[in-house]
Amino acid sequence: SQTWLAPHQSVVGVSEQVDGSIGPLDISSVRQSEHVDASLTSAEIDSEQRSQLEFDLRHEALTVRRGIIELAHRYSSTPFHIGGACSVADIVSVLLSKVMQVGHRDCEWELRDRLILSKAHTSLALFPALLRAEMISQEDIDRGVFGPDAVLFKHPLRDPQRGFEISGGSLGMGLGYAAGLGLSIRRKDLLSRVFCILGDGECDEGSIWESAAFIGHNQLSNVTVIVDQNRMQLDGPCASILDTGSIARKFDAFGFESVEVDGHDVLALYDALKQQTSRPRAIIAHTIKGKGLSFAENNVSFHDACVTDDLYEQALLDLKVAEEACSC
């Protein structure tokens, strides 16, 4: 394969590229969600609004999972990080549809909230979520994730206008970047928040804890860390590779306020992500690797795998069942 750079692109953060293009991702069957009043938790709205909120959030997550499969299948001979993308789907859906102040949609650009996907190998989950948030266009997706015309990549290139605040690929780097953003935002007296998504395997990296120490020491309350704890990494179960004990307790020790939630309970995620206190927050989201796909759930081989025609058909059946259950 060959690395391609468009004329305006830097070599920094560019992934290995091959030829190819992506067809359109059809999301017309799922309604566009409306932004929810950020001053209210799900428990503070009436039952009808709460049910509608849950319905919207679950459909957003299904849209993301459908987007993951569609994009990966169009490059069926190229492996993608399907498992981690599906485990983080609910998190990015809730963030971008209901929690974050997105610059192009909700506020002045400088006042936007920032999302750092430190586990950048799962960027496939971000594309459909950013499309729904109007940060990227259908044309961007149509140009593909490989080749000289691509503006989206398997490992993202920094492009804040499209929602990519940092180039990705090397694990352990995102939280340090989030720390710098949080400090800069505070010094500018802005109310913006910084959300940083980590993987639990990524938390083996020492740089994560250096950054956590800095954030805790400076009490950067505008920084919220979300750990996608699917308990698996490239080589197997996290506990077998390097058992580091409770991630929540570690963040507590660095001065964070930590909370543990079901990472596929969209209302629990919504409430946890909306809260902001006088301390930085760490949300440990207990998830299932490959969530929503019968062949990929808790299957470490789908850490990085191809979506064949047969798997694609099975995925569509799985998502159809989930869609029907959501509508009941």
What spans do the regions from the language model cover?
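Thiamine diphosphate
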Residues: 163, 167-275
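Generic beta-sheet signal
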Residues: 113-115, 192-196, 223, 278-287
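Intrinsically disordered, low-complexity repeat/linker tracts enriched for polar/charged residues
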Residues: 14-17, 35
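Glycine/aspartate-rich loop-and-adjacent alpha/beta segment that forms the canonical ThDP
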Residues: 266-328
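Cofactor-binding active-site loop characterized by glycine-rich and histidine/acidic residues
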Residues: 86-210, 216-217
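N-terminal amphipathic, basic-rich helices that act as targeting or association modules
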Residues: 30, 41-122
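Glycine-rich beta-alpha junction loops
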Residues: 121-122, 230-231, 265, 287-290
